[in-house]
Every structure is written in structure tokens, then in C-alpha cells.
Amino acid sequence: MSHLSDAGFWDLVHIARRPIVASHSNARAVCPHRRNLTDDQFRAIRDSGGVVGLNLYLHFVGQPTMDALVAHVEHFLALDGEKTLCLGGDLDGCEALAAGMTGMQDVPKLYEALKARGYSDALLEDIFWNNLRRLI
């Protein structure tokens, strides 16, 4: 789903018989890139029981800050995405990651940023591990 056009997305939603996965997508409301998901697209994935993997690629985050990356998380959580959001990364072939990240070794920085904003360990474990594990 992460590489589909809007029309292709909805075509697939109408024929999907299993949970839908957008393996590396962010919120278009936060960063208006055509590859990011609209709120309606996120809800369709959520309602299917699927997952959306947070994309760390700078051009889909919008700004090179941790706050910009966290804004995508908070937007999806505001759409009742606690059991939908997971990590997607899109680390292969990317020349620039958000928030000064250089690779997987920096993902704990996102965990710490969310923890500092008051998110519970249980919610963060869902986002960082359980939501994707539930699906696979």
C-alpha cells in the first residue's frame, strides 16, 4: 500500500480480504507528500485490522526534527491508531532520515522522545513491537 496511488489504494481496499499493511507510510495531514496516507486511508487500514509502519525517511516526515517525526505518531494516535501504528523505517536506500537518525541503531531515540512526552511503556511496546507481531 505504501507505494500505491490514491486510486490504487482504494481499489485494493475494496477487494482486500485480509488486514491491510502500509509497511512504511506517514500522515499526509502532517506532511503533504503524495506517498503519505490520508486520514481516510489510515482509518481503512485500521478498520481492516492492519498496520501502518511509521516511515523514517526525511522527505516523508517533512522536517529534520524529532518533533516532526513525533507529530506523525501523535496524528495517527489521534485517529485511534494505538493498535495500528508500528515501525516501518524504509531504511534501505534512503539518503536522509529524520531527526538526525542514521540507521536502526537510532530508533531508541524515537522511543525516548515518545516516553518523554508521557506515552506509556505499554503503548510504546505496541507501536515498537506488538502491533506488527500480532499481524504476522
Where do the PLM segments sit?
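Beta-strand segments within the central parallel beta-sheet cores of soluble alpha/beta enzyme folds
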Residues: 1, 11, 86-88, 125-129
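Histidine/acidic residue-rich metal-binding segments in metalloenzymes
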Residues: 1-21, 34-49, 68-83
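A conserved active-site cap/scaffold subdomain adjacent to cofactor or substrate pockets
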Residues: 46, 51-61
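Short acidic/histidine-rich active-site segments
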Residues: 56, 80-104
